[in-house]
Amino acid sequence: SSTYFTFTTNQIFGADATSTTWITESIDLGGYMVLDTACQRSCCGEVWLKTHAKILERHGLRVKMIESSDQFQFGSGKPIAAAERAYIPIEMEGQETKGLLFGVSVLSTNIPFLASRTLLERLGCIIDMFTKTITFANLGVTLPLTHKHGHLAVNIAMFSEDLANHPCWKHLSRDQLWHEPDPELMFAPGAFNKGSIRDLPPQA
């Protein structure tokens, strides 16, 4: 049987009242991931991926695509299947380490990159609404919170100069890493602060 990744609704989670959901156009969110703590698996729409891929191309980077059978459900709607999963190179402002790929299931919908709770936890995400900052402890990065259409979002395309020629990508191109790749996160050695990741499988 298939596993469905379901977004928060009052029908599924038993909330007393329906919360407001913003309709977000993906075309102006290229380069950003939206923080979605109710999402169990990261996903994006085809339009967002095409827009983001053009940003990557300007930096000499590209998306890696693999087959996928992930299924998602938005509210009480019918499940939507993802035929592919994209692995996208990312870099945040102030990030000193290199070699991170975020895995995102690609859906035939017009949604931005919705970063799952699983991904955020593994990055050591700490959202501070009081100081309006977001910290990714496992990357050693603290950033101002960005709001896009009512959502919290993070710029993941702050690429440093000549990143495309960094040796980390050679490591991440090794065939043995892609037999059963982690669905949310792939990384090169040294990509995280030493001793900060406890739940990630080795990717030697």
For the regions a language model picked out, list residue spans one by one.
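Charged, flexible boundary elements
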Residues: S1-S26, A204
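Intrinsically disordered, low-complexity regions enriched in Ser/Pro/Gly/Gln/His and often acidic
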Residues: A15, R41, M65-E67, D162, ...
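Eukaryotic intrinsically disordered and solvent-exposed regulatory patches
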Residues: A17-W22, D28-G30, Q73-G77, L120-R122
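Aspartyl protease active-site motif detector
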Residues: T20-E67, F102-V104, S108-S116
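Structural motif
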Residues: R41, S69-Q71, T131-T133
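C-terminal reverse transcriptase regions that engage the nucleic-acid substrate
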Residues: I66-E84
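Aspartic protease core domain of the pepsin/retropepsin superfamily
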Residues: A82-A204
